[in-house]
């Protein structure tokens, strides 16, 4: 649970900071009305894609690993009545994220109306590094952290 919370903090923090850059560039925070972000800010769009993949718990994200542990723990404990609504809520969140963020990245837009001075490549690079670290934690786990998780779980 601690690893899951830490990963969510890093990923959602990166996601929301990148959304603030989107707001500065487009002049509003209505993500569904905006588009063309890949052409306006390629590095920022890469951060958004990586955050989206991490938030929907796509492997090798650390959230995939922790949610898998949570769900297998629920099922092995016979708590299917908790598992079903949580899994349905997770599917709804994944749908909502994809429905809101993918149009921002792929919809055509008039790039003349976008304030490209609002881009912050240094911030985007740091955010991308944070998200890549969470992907690395999903692939490679420090032995000490694995021992701590095993001690807590078992």
Where are these regions (language model features)?
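Functional transmembrane alpha-helices
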Residues: 1-118
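Enriched - but not universal
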Residues: 83-84, 125, 143
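Hydrophobic core of alpha-helical transmembrane segments in multi-pass integral membrane proteins
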Residues: 87, 126-137
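C-terminal membrane-solvent junction of multi-pass transporters and transport-like membrane proteins
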Residues: 117-128
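Juxtamembrane boundary at the C-terminal end of a transmembrane helix
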Residues: 137-154
């Amino acid at each position: 649970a601690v690893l899951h919370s830490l990963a969510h903090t890093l990923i959602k923090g990166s996601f929301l900071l990148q959304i603030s850059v989107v707001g500065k560039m487009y002049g509003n925070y209505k993500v569904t009305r905006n588009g063309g972000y890949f052409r306006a800010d390629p590095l920022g769009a890469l951060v958004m894609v990586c955050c989206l993949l991490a938030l929907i718990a796509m492997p090798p994200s650390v959230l995939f690993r922790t949610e898998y542990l949570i769900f297998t723990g629920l099922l092995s404990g016979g708590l299917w009545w908790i598992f079903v609504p949580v899994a349905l809520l997770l599917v709804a969140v994944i749908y909502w994220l994809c429905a809101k963020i993918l149009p921002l990245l792929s919809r055509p837009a008039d790039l003349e109306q976008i304030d490209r001075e609002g881009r912050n490549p240094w911030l985007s690079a740091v955010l991308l590094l944070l998200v890549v670290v969470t992907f690395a934690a999903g692939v490679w786990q420090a032995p000490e952290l694995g021992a701590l998780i095993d001690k807590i779980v078992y």
